[in-house]
Amino acid sequence: MTYSIGIDYGTASGRVFLVDTTNGEIISTYIKEYPHGTISESLNGTELPHNYFLQHAADYTSILEEGVQYVLKDSQVDPKSIIGIGIDFTSCTIVFLDDDFKPLHLHPDLEDQPHAYVKLWKHHGAQDEATYMKQVSDKVNPSWLNFYGHNVNSEWMIPKILEVKNKAPEVLERSAYIMEAGDYLVSLLTDKNIRSNCGIGFKGFYNETDGFNYSFFEAIDQELPEIVKTKCESPVVNIGESAGSLSPYYQNLWGLTEQVQISPYIIDAHSGVLGVGAIEQGEFTPVIGTSTCHLMLDPKQEPIPAITGSVKDAIIPGLYAYEAGQAAVGDLFNYSASLAPKSYVDQAEKQGLSILGYLEKLAADISIDKQHVTVLDWHNGNRSILSDSKLTGSIFGLTLQTPFEMIHKAYLESTAFGTKMIMQQFENNHIPVETVYAAGGIPIKSELLVDIYANVLNKEVVVIDSSNATALGAAMLGANVGGAYPTLKETVKHMKQPVYYRKQPEAKKVKQYALLFDRYKALHDLLGKEYPQLSYIN
């Protein structure tokens, strides 16, 4: 019997799972919130801009070291039976490192410099740089963005590098390496400077044929090609291949052997596709968490407007992985719940429910034909299909009689409408959707949300019996590179979890939600395309 370890780094916490490679059974789990949290309001007493989201790299390494030690001790498995480790990470999260792979913000003279810290995926301080990159491409060579939806997102690697170049050049000068946080951890585990094709393919303008797009970079800034060559270039390892053996340092720390193979890191949502087993053409997977990432696999590459990327071999070898996304989903539900009147909070406590659970209970009783509230789900900007992080959310249709649960239900519905905009974009560009796999912890907890999605999308929605799909997907990658099965597809088939439940669309609800979607789309196009300045905060 052999085991693998999957390490899942989300927005707020890290999780380490020890998993049986024969059937995907989770043997031991370690979960820890990041001690420093997300740094978004102030840094060491200095106020930060509203769109800054930073983190502390020591949180990642402490979870790595403590978590693996814990699951090994807790499970009591033979260390020789551990064959591989996989890591997923929320992306695009960027770390700036010195020559010794030490994060720059750990240097005392840079501890007050925000641009020396980890830039979390939802850090939107690089919007001006992203807008400029799009303008350059439109003017010089629009084909540069053919496979990025003809957009540049401020969350990606190159805009964030340019942001530091423009706002804190001393940080850029002192950095020897700039890499995704997932690549940073894999490089530590292997004692190599490694890049995953998944991360740089989707977030770094890199493809398997040409490498980095240096022509594009030079048109943006003449210094950018050299910055990328010296600080970002290194051997690229594809998903499904081994990044290397576990380094002697970690062998000694954990009591493991050199046979342990390390997978290149995979973006967390992409790992969720593996975790739920949605690895065939026509399977559409929204990985629903803090935000939502929408993934599809297809043997062909199509230039789809407003879809944020397509990369070969980034999830399953031989297939192109397509990605789109919504910048806030679980965050939206938490935001809505945080606004609940005190009387609702008191009732929730009286009934032994969380405020989210109580609001959902009330929202489930609101018939669709009575819903008159519409929300634009742009509280953290719009990733797809508008790719504009400056857009802000809106609520329409309020009256003096509107109950709070109707507003909360409108938040749930808005995320389904946003997902439908994305699904239609795929289907209108020769990538048909047959089945929807809802991944992540939220679909397990919220049958109401899954029911809304099934009827808004007019598709069967399959929920897998695992709220840990991303961590399980990472463990699958560890098992695969460790040699548990001949191929990654075989690994997934053996280790995926069973179906928890399926939700079929109902004709009456589908018809009712089509009317609400038309209202959402009209507002979406009006405030997102025709008059976006009305949604901007100056």
Curated annotation (Swiss-Prot):
CDD domains: ASKHA_NBD_FGGY_L-RBK (cd07781). GO terms for biological process: L-arabinose catabolic process to xylulose 5-phosphate. One of its GO terms (molecular function) is ribulokinase activity. Pathway: Carbohydrate degradation; L-arabinose degradation via L-ribulose; D-xylulose 5-phosphate from L-arabinose (bacterial route): step 2/3. The keyword Kinase applies. InterPro entries: ATPase_NBD, Carb_kinase_FGGY, FGGY_C, FGGY_N, Ribulokinase. Its EC number is 2.7.1.16. NCBIfam families: PRK04123.1. Belongs to the ribulokinase family. This is Ribulokinase 1. It comes from Staphylococcus saprophyticus subsp. saprophyticus (strain ATCC 15305 / DSM 20229 / NCIMB 8711 / NCTC 7292 / S-41). The lineage of its organism: Bacteria, Bacillati, Bacillota, Bacilli, Bacillales.
